[in-house]
UniProtKB/Swiss-Prot annotation:
It is an enzyme of class 1 (oxidoreductase). It catalyses: nitrite + NADP(+) + H2O = nitrate + NADPH + H(+). It comes from Phytophthora infestans. It comes from the Eukaryota. Belongs to the nitrate reductase family. GO terms for biological process: nitrate assimilation; nitric oxide biosynthetic process; sulfur compound metabolic process. Nitrate reductase is a key enzyme involved in the first step of nitrate assimilation in plants, fungi and bacteria. PANTHER family: SULFITE OXIDASE, MITOCHONDRIAL, SULFITE REDUCTASE. Residues 637-751 form the FAD-binding FR-type domain. The gene is NIAA. This is Nitrate reductase [NADPH]. Keywords: Disulfide bond, FAD, Flavoprotein, Heme, Iron, Metal-binding, Molybdenum, NADP, Nitrate assimilation, Oxidoreductase. The lineage of its organism: Eukaryota, Sar, Stramenopiles, Oomycota, Peronosporales. Its EC number is 1.7.1.3.
Length: 902
């Protein structure tokens, strides 16, 4: 495990350094894109906000407690990096900037995400790290042209433009903080008991921001609302979804009540709303679930009856535990109004210790009562109810300790509190050593109490049992390891994937087996096909599936079976786009992370065959999307012809091959850190090899792609006397001859400013270490160039380049040019193994200022050191396995979480 020192928790009154808290990121790289310190701030009103609290019924009651006013408060969303995520390219949302640390819960599209749980430790959430719940594409709206209407039971129906709204109600505009929570927060715990019909929210589906807008009751009053007849107020957004626009409703008694503080908002944290958060205008209903707060607001309708909108009826309900998705529809459960969720329930979560944190113990493990470890977390309730108590137990509820509650806001004039609180408890080390788990529960002012165990419901909503963090005594490291119940989305980890848990469901009082999260494509297919049915299915090659990627014919692969989704496109609850993005590809991971057992059963009717890879695709992994970009050459699974236009001899056995792309204005379209496959017919058979180009995506490289390739000549190596099949073929190509290229592929992608991803998980590095051998320099050069040619990128790099002799040093001139650009940021060290064979007094040896041997521990220690967040390696297997990895282990690198092999 990788262990990072944490200053966020304390162990007090210990005279010897026997204890140290370490944060472990098992199975992932340390990811600190936003430094935690700037986030550990509390809220103060932004003095520059033009719309102050002035409405007389609310004035002076939206303030934050005076003890917090000395802090420089909100972290602006613009201070937190957001960027266009490559995963959004080819989707309707490819124009929307998003923070790379947001955890995607529903694949590429639509976008639903939550931040890592550690960011819930701050009162105000930067909007770039605010959770997002979208049902479809983000509408692309303009401030100057967007309008929304108010109609129904009002005397003066009106349509408001944004400028009119802001100026007309400037005196009534208010700003105050509100917690937003998705009703599915903590749903993954329910999915571990039994699959619900909802995707797997973790424990960070909640965020607090400072919202600016006009109270809804002011708008309704201005329109002459009929208070006697009005029973419900409907809200609709502008987006078009498969069944209906997104709409819902809330009782008029809530909307017209000044105590309830319902807002029509256009700002968050002092800035105009972002695209994912409803720009230009949305609804804020404090104390209620996020599903009632319509974004991209287009219509407000006052009515004497409840809305029949599809999303109001079919979403955000807690049905009895015995009700399944099928019986809910057959028996009419969805339309029963009492099961609709409005206000939030009481809930609490442990933030510190985080999942897989380690609490290292010294040799002396006898502790007195004043030696403590601080447990921290958040708690909230709905309806404006105050959280009055947070309790922690270390003995499974036999006794409880009161945590100190940190209130960031003060109550409104009416006694309402709309935000979360944070709590902390200094737990005695002597108790932690004997404990099996840390459990937390909260109470609110109505004496609502979190239950000990979950009650399953088909939508997995409002899950609020005690939050349980398991404690494991790790004998090999003499430390305590903390394990949270789950990790958000399709992330691995959590004790609920391994154990049984209890339920107090009166219809099913029994131990429920946790469903395994097996996403292996080799696992038994789920759709209920028998062995006989499987054997009768025709065999369909992956190349054939790849052709069916349009609305006219959309096939996909899931768990080695082929499905024709064309008839289902218009019926899909998430819209046709999310299926079309997977058209022609294997979408096993996305399907399994999102869909319920019901969806698996529905698959059966669309199954048309068994999948088999073609010869060309066997064993390859295409991580790209198959969207058609007009200015790039690479087309995902499609092979693209390229023509050799030059060959440059750069050493006795290395060549630069330059190929023309299909059009001179095309970029290759290769993300930094990715590679491509080259295909050629050799001796009547298709051969394929992976290479990384040395050309860039810059304008000067449009229209062509260049590769630096070592030619393995026949007879050079007695172990492989025939030499390299593919490299010799390339060396023998005549100008004008054609091969094929396919991609992009690869598990490592660099986005800039230290941000990178491995597979689908985002990380951040302040320093990279690189070790390259021979032509393994090409992917390293690609990443180093991206860093060092970007004046804004401050990421440090340290390279050890291992070759046999000076003539084998490829790209040396280019590397040293990069170093001259950023000398304080880049360190390069060469080492020549052939010098071990020469006399020390040889002039060649004496004149060489770098390494004179094979790679060794001293080189890695002195050049790369122990402070790189990730060490990337590319070269001969022997160099990596017997030199790189042992040296990195000795420097306490975790090979699983801190190294990447290209």
């Amino acid at each position: 495990m990788t262990r990072l020192r944490s200053a966020a928790s304390t162990i007090t009154n210990r005279s010897t350094p026997a204890l140290a808290l370490t944060a472990s990121h098992a199975g992932s790289h340390p990811a600190v894109i936003v430094p935690i310190q700037p986030l550990l701030l509390t809220l103060e009103r932004r003095p520059s906000c033009p719309h102050r609290v002035s409405y007389p019924e609310i004035e002076a009651y939206r303030g934050i407690s005076s003890s917090l006013r000395s802090h420089n408060a909100i972290v602006r969303a613009s201070d937190i990096m957001a960027q266009i995520d490559p995963r959004d390219v080819g989707t309707p949302d490819e124009w929307v900037p998003r923070h790379p640390e947001l955890i995607r819960l529903t694949g590429r599209h639509p976008f639903n995400s939550e931040p890592p749980l550690k960011y819930a430790s701050t009162f105000i959430t930067p909007m770039a790290l605010h959770y997002v719940r979208n049902h479809g594409p983000v509408p692309r709206l303009e401030w100057d042209t967007h309008t929304f209407s108010i109609d129904g039971l009002v005397k003066k129906p009106r349509t408001f433009g944004m400028n009119e709204l802001v100026t007309t109600f400037e005196q009534e505009t208010v700003t105050f903080p509100v917690l937003l929570v998705c009703a599915g927060n903590r749903r993954k715990e329910q999915n571990m008991i039994k699959k619900t019909i909802g995707f797997s929210w973790g424990a960070a589906g909640c965020s607090t921001a400072e919202w600016t807008g006009v109270p809804l009751h002011v708008l309704l009053t201005a329109c002459g609302v009929d208070r006697e007849k009005a029973q419900w107020v409907w809200f609709e957004g502008i987006e078009d979804l498969p069944h209906d626009k997104y709409g819902t409703c809330i009782r008029a008694s809530t909307e017209l009540d000044p105590e309830c503080d319902v807002l029509v908002a256009w700002k968050a944290n002092g800035e105009l709303l972002g695209p994912d958060h409803g720009f230009p205008v949305r609804l804020i209903v404090p104390g209620h679930i996020g599903g009632r707060m319509v974004k991209w607001l287009e219509r407000i309708h006052v009515s004497d009856h409840e809305s029949s909108n599809h999303h109001h009826i079919m979403d955000n309900r807690v049905l009895p535990s015995h009700v399944t998705a099928e019986t809910a529809t057959a028996e009419g459960w969805w339309s029963k109004s009492p099961y609709a969720i409005m206000e939030l329930n009481v809930n609490a979560v442990v933030i510190l210790p985080n999942h897989d944190d380690l609490l290292a113990l010294g040799e002396d493990t006898t502790f007195n009562d004043i030696e403590t470890y601080t447990i921290k977390g958040y708690a909230y309730s709905g309806g404006g109810r105050r959280v009055i108590r947070v309790e922690v137990t270390l003995d499974d509820g036999a006794s409880w300790q009161l945590a100190r509650i940190i209130y960031h806001e003060r109550p409104s004039k009416y006694g309402k509190m709309w935000c979360w609180v944070h709590y902390e408890l200094a737990a005695p080390m002597s108790s932690l050593l004997c404990a099996r788990e840390v459990c937390v529960r909260a109470w609110d002012s109505s004496m609502n109490l979190m239950p000990a165990f979950p009650t399953w419901n088909v939508m997995g909503m409002m899950n609020n049992p005690w939050y349980r963090v398991k404690i494991h005594h790790e004998q090999d490291t003499n430390s305590l390891r903390f394990e949270h119940p789950t990790q958000a989305g399709n992330q691995k980890g959590g004790w609920m994937t391994k154990e049984r848990i209890m339920t107090n469901d009166v219809d099913s009082i029994k131990m429920l087996q946790v469903e395994p999260l097996d996403t292996s494509s080799a696992a038994t297919p789920k759709p209920g096909l028998t062995a006989d049915e499987l054997s009768e299915l025709p065999l369909i090659f992956a190349d054939e599936v790849a052709k069916h990627n349009s609305k006219k014919s959309c096939w996909f692969i899931c768990r080695d079976l082929v499905y024709d989704a064309t008839p289902f496109l218009d019926e899909h609850p998430g819209g046709a786009t999310s299926i079309l993005l997977c058209g022609g590809t294997d979408c096993t991971d996305e399907f399994e992370s999102i869909h319920s057992t019901k969806a698996w059963q529905m698959l059966k009717k669309y199954c048309i065959g068994r999948c088999s890879s073609t010869e060309d695709d066997t064993g390859t992994s295409d991580t790209s999307s198959d969207h058609e970009e007009t200015d790039v050459a690479l087309k995902g699974r499609t092979k693209v012809p390229i023509v050799l236009i030059s060959r440059e001899v750069v050493s006795h056995d290395a060549r630069i091959f330059k190929f023309a792309l299909p059009a001179k204005d095309l970029r290759l379209g290769l993300p930094i850190g990715n590679h491509v496959f080259l295909y050629a017919k050799i001796n009547g058979k298709t051969a394929v090899r992976a290479y990384t180009p040395i050309s860039s995506e810059n304008d000067e490289d449009r229209g062509f792609v260049s590769f630096l390739i070592k030619v393995y000549f026949a007879g050079d190596n007695p172990v492989h006397p025939e030499g390299g099949l593919f490299s010799q073929y390339l060396d023998g190509l005549h100008l004008g001859q054609q091969i094929q290229i396919k991609g992009p592929l690869g598990h490592f992608t660099y986005y800039g400013d230290g941000n990178f991803s491995l597979e689908t998980t985002n990380f951040h590095a302040y320093k990279f270490g690189f070790v390259a051998g021979g032509t393994g320099i090409t992917p390293v050069y690609q990443v180093m160039r991206a860093i060092l040619e970007d004046a804004k990128d401050q990421t440090k790099v340290a390279l050890i380049y291992c070759v046999r002799s000076q003539r084998d040093l490829l790209l040396r001139k280019e590397l040293e040019t990069l170093q001259k650009l950023r000398p304080g940021q880049c360190r390069i060290f060469y080492t020549l193994s052939d010098m071990e064979l020469l006399d020390r007094n040889d002039p060649i040896v004496r004149g060489w200022a770098y390494g004179k041997s094979r790679l060794n521990f001293a080189m890695v220690k002195n050049i790369i050191g122990s402070d790189a967040e990730d060490v990337c390696m590319c070269g001969p297997e022997g160099m990596i396995e017997y030199a790189c990895k042992p040296a990195l282990l000795k420097l306490n690198y975790d090979l699983k979480t801190q190294t990447t092999v290209f």
